[in-house]
A protein has these predicted regions:
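Structural preference for beta-strand elements that scaffold enzyme active sites
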Residues: 547-549, 593-595, 668-671, 712-714
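Bacterial signal peptide processing site
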Residues: 26-28
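Aromatic-lined carbohydrate-binding/catalytic grooves of carbohydrate-active enzymes
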Residues: 498-651, 677, 681
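Carbohydrate-recognition beta-sandwich/jelly-roll modules
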Residues: 43-46, 64-523, 534-543, 547
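Bacterial N-terminal signal peptides that target proteins for export
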Residues: 2-11
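Active-site-proximal substrate-binding groove within the catalytic cores of carbohydrate-active enzymes
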Residues: 74, 79-86, 103, 389-429, ...
Length: 881
């Protein structure tokens, strides 16, 4: 990303003059400089490239690219791109066009302009004012031969597509109306202009000739106060008109001739002219944003890329966010269809649903390093950066697209907007945060004011969105999920075991508040020792439960006083190393895995100065913290839930030592739970890591911890960047957030992962509605998961673990055995199979079919349901083979 700076220009001019004596430096100085201060070849993004030349026309549009499946077309009048499906004839447009509003005569012109835009940006000016620009109103409409604001270029060799560069910004041409001109400049302009331009130039300037020799003493004093160099040059002072008139002169007559007489921008030309005149006037920065977008036609659809390091704008403006193709595929003709959004497991939104509500869903969940941002509460997490839309058309049949964000998703979110009385068409698309900031209130001033503090640097990386097009029977959420599954797992081997898994999670050492002679202190207590964990495991096996994998938390001590230097050490009160090794081997002998949980991301906040050197920070400079659970359980506890976030670089530097510690126990796998459920940015000045860059470092941690996938891995929730490494995922969402405009939840995530990664929903014995969670687990192909401890409920009193008060294994043993027996009866045999289809048979009955031919029917209703002579009990399920 590049910004324009006056200081850089001055420095370069001085250097250039010095070098002229040695190398003959050119007098043309590039004023673009990268924000990171690195040396680089400065290139004007707007003019760099080979001009696009169409290979022909089709349907009245320029042909950009063509392959066996699709044709990419461009309307050069408004920059709209169309992808035509050769098989169905259906056309996907990057944005709406004028003809889409034929039945909307009363639509607001501003709303129409939004729909007709490919880009929408938000920036903040020097006063902190939020301003929104869209590419149609602020680029396409102002584009003409004299004022180019949209340019078309070829993609690099070997790529089929087009690069469109937009100059998106405000027209403040009146500010560039010259207050005066030297006589020489006037004459140069006059010669370069056409007859109408000459007339206008004379009209504004010819009567204003000022020469020091002809001025009276009184006039000299007055004129010199304004134009200090009047002794050296004769000038024409302007006779200014209205703002509209002056802007028209600049736009219609001055801009077209500047390229003929000057190698630079209008602003640079005028600044040099004012310097010659000795006229002190600082020209305003132009709120103009140069944004390049690369569109590449592929065999499967369209790839869209925005290289944010090539964005250009004045440094006095802060580009906060950028929407890329927010109206791609928007349906306007009343057809039926659904938007597919990554809300939890996935959700459908009918495109004909009207609602005043909308939602923005951040990919990979909330960034807890940004505390003042508004996030919707109680939302299920988005774990896959994808979204889609399907439409059924009477002429073209069923068509759909699924979009997958492959770079920049750490900065991104997807926005879903049902139609309203003002916005007549539903739409969804991605937004990316370019320059994060926090808002604070200044309480010390006479009147409280909001202050903005930005990260030291904006995000400078790629944004890439791949659109895959589907038709016919594949044009629904199932086809979309299969396409995404093939992207993540197309080259992976499936699971080998078909037996249903049982996940048993337990806790070792905790701290609880106790008192001695009136003094409160934190005493160590054991929820489940190693010997007790073994006993529970043996009892579960005796009860008929098999294929058990164990997650052992707090085996190095209470996680709320975690220290990364302590990770990998066995807490003394839990048992011996030999006992731990024996338990690990026992579980593995039976075909399962014992996953000791390694908390690599979070540390206890000690308050010491050294914490700042190896912990992540928020924008305002304080340490980034994370609680991970509701503060409702915090009452009376002396150990805070909030822990500090460890820098990814610090984790990588200590990881070899941690792995060596684990090798001494013979562990074949670990749980890195937090790494799969949270993604933290770091705003340390020296180690600034935007969320997208943090994602890449997380992947490095996963790669190193698992020795490139040789070790088994368990994570929580399962953000998609863990898919290459995860064997087991706990707490996968089994539903959506139940937003008012959502039609229903869908197993999108499960269709993507089933057969390749084992997973479970939330712990059954901690669920608010155990029966519903069990039914959902069966419908979505999830394994069973219980949290079981040896300690009695009273053990968690006055601790950070009050939420575990009902996890004593004696309380849940019989139910766990019964649940496993019932669920394994229908899910055994499908664990290595992908989900082939998912159907709603009636209001409360759903059927999931696997590629091996097995169908599992789940009845949520209160009455028995019959399917092809198979009876499905109320609140029950059956397998049909």
């Amino acid at each position: 990303m590049k910004v324009k700076t006056k200081l850089f220009r001055l420095i370069m001019l001085l250097l250039c003059f010095a070098l002229m004596f040695v190398t003959g430096c050119s007098n043309n100085v590039d004023v673009e400089t990268a924000t990171d201060g690195e040396d680089n070849d400065e290139v004007d993004t707007f003019t760099a490239g080979t001009e696009f030349v169409s290979s022909g026309t089709q349907d009245g549009y320029s042909i950009v690219a063509d392959n066996a499946n699709y044709t990419l077309l461009l309307d050069e009048s408004d920059a709209t791109l169309r992808v035509k499906n050769k098989k169905t004839g259906y056309v996907w447009k990057t944005n709406l066009t004028e003809d889409d509003f034929a039945n909307q005569p009363n639509i607001d012109e501003g709303v129409k302009a939004e729909y007709m835009s490919q880009l929408d940006l938000v920036y903040y000016d020097g006063t902190g004012k939020r301003i929104n620009y869209n590419s149609y109103s602020y680029a396409v409409q102002s584009n003409d031969e004299y004022n180019k604001t949209v340019a078309y270029y070829q993609l690099p060799s070997g790529k089929d597509g087009i690069r469109i560069v937009y100059k998106i910004g405000e027209n403040i041409d009146d500010a560039y109306f010259p207050a005066a001109l030297t006589v020489d400049t006037y004459n140069t302009l006059y010669e370069a202009m056409d007859d109408e331009g000459k007339f206008q130039l004379e009209l504004y300037y010819l009567e204003g000739l000022l020469s020091y020799k002809t001025l009276s003493d009184a006039e000299r004093s007055s004129v010199m106060a304004e134009f200090k160099n009047i002794k050296k040059v004769d000038i024409y002072k302007s006779q200014p008109g209205s703002k509209i008139q002056m802007a028209a002169f600049v736009n219609d007559y001055l801009k077209p001739v500047i390229p003929k007489i000057y190698d630079g921008s209008l602003k640079e030309w005028l600044e040099e002219e004012y310097e010659v005149l000795g006229y002190d006037f600082e020209l305003p920065d132009v709120p103009m944003f140069v944004v390049p977008v690369n569109y590449e036609l592929t065999e499967q659809g369209l790839s869209v890329n925005v290289p944010t390091d090539e964005l250009q704008f004045e440094e006095s403006f802060r580009l906060y966010s950028l929407k890329v193709l927010p109206f791609f595929g928007t349906v306007t003709n009343g057809n039926k269809g659904n938007m597919v959004i990554p809300d939890g497991s996935g959700a459908l939104v009918d495109i004909n649903t009207q609602s005043k509500d909308s939602i923005s869903i951040p990919f990979y969940g909330q960034d807890y390093s940004l505390r003042t941002k508004d996030y919707a509460e109680n939302m299920e997490q988005s774990t896959i950066p994808t979204f889609g839309l399907d439409v059924t058309d009477a002429t073209y049949g069923k068509n759909a697209f699924v979009a997958h964000v492959t770079s920049g998703e750490g900065q991104g979110s997807v926005e879903c907007h049902p139609k309203t009385t003002i916005y007549p068409f539903s739409y969804l698309g991605p937004t990316f945060e370019i320059h994060p900031f926090e808002t604070f209130k200044s309480e010390g001033a006479a009147k409280a004011a909001e202050l903005q503090k930005y990260s030291d640097k904006p995000y400078e990386g790629n944004i890439t969105i791949n659109y895959y097009f589907l038709n016919g029977e594949d044009a629904d959420y199932i086809g979309m999920a299969k396409k995404i599954r093939n992207i993540y797992f197309g080259d992976k081997e499936k699971l080998t075991l078909d037996k249903t898994k049982f996940y048993y999670e337990t806790y070792g050492e905790i701290l609880r508040k106790e008192t001695l002679v009136g003094y409160a202190y934190n005493a160590k207590a054991q929820m489940t020792t190693i010997a007790q964990a073994k006993a529970i495991y043996e009892k579960l096996k005796a009860g008929g439960i098999s294929n058990i994998s164990v997650k052992y938390n707090n085996w190095s001590g209470d996680e709320f006083v975690n220290s990364i230097s302590n990770v990998g050490k066995l807490a003394k009160g839990l048992g011996s190393k030999d006992e731990f090794v024996e338990l690990i081997q026992l579980v593995e002998k039976d075909g399962g895995t014992l996953y000791p949980n390694l908390e690599l991301m979070l540390d206890k906040d000690t308050g010491e100065l050294t914490d700042a050197t190896w912990h992540s920070k928020m924008i305002e400079g304080t340490l980034a913290t994370y609680a991970g659970r509701s503060t409702l359980y915090q009452e009376g506890v002396t150990v805070p839930f909030d822990r500090t976030v460890i820098k990814t670089g610090e984790i990588l530097s200590k990881l070899d030592g941690i792995v060596k510690k684990m090798d001494k126990f013979g562990a074949k796998g670990y749980s890195l739970s937090t790494l799969g459920s949270t993604l933290f940015s770091d705003y340390n000045k020296n180690t600034l890591t935007h969320r997208e860059n943090a994602k890449l470092k997380y992947i490095s941690i996963l790669d190193k911890a698992t020795n490139k996938g040789e070790k088994k891995l368990m994570v929580e929730m399962g953000n998609a960047y863990t898919y290459d490494y995860a064997d087991d995922i706990l707490n996968v969402s089994l539903g959506n957030s139940n937003l008012m405009f959502e039609a229903e939840s869908i197993p999108f995530v499960q269709i993507v992962t089933h057969g390749y990664i084992s997973y479970s929903g939330s712990a059954l014995n901690l669920s608010d509605n155990k029966e519903m969670t069990l039914l959902k687990s069966v419908e979505y192909g999830a394994n069973l998961y219980y949290v079981l401890n040896n300690a009695s409920p009273s053990a968690v009193k006055n601790s950070n673990y009050s939420s575990l008060f009902s996890t004593n294994y004696d309380r849940w043993y019989d139910e766990a055995c019964a649940d496993y027996k019932a669920v394994s009866a229908v899910l055994d045999g499908v664990q290595s199979s992908c989900i082939e289809s998912h159907k709603k048979l009636s209001k409360d009955v759903y059927m999931t079919t696997y590629e091996n031919g097995t169908s599992v029917i789940v009845n949520y209703g209160s009455a028995e349901y019959t399917y092809n002579n198979t009876k499905v009990p109320a609140k029950g399920f059956v397998a049909v083979k």
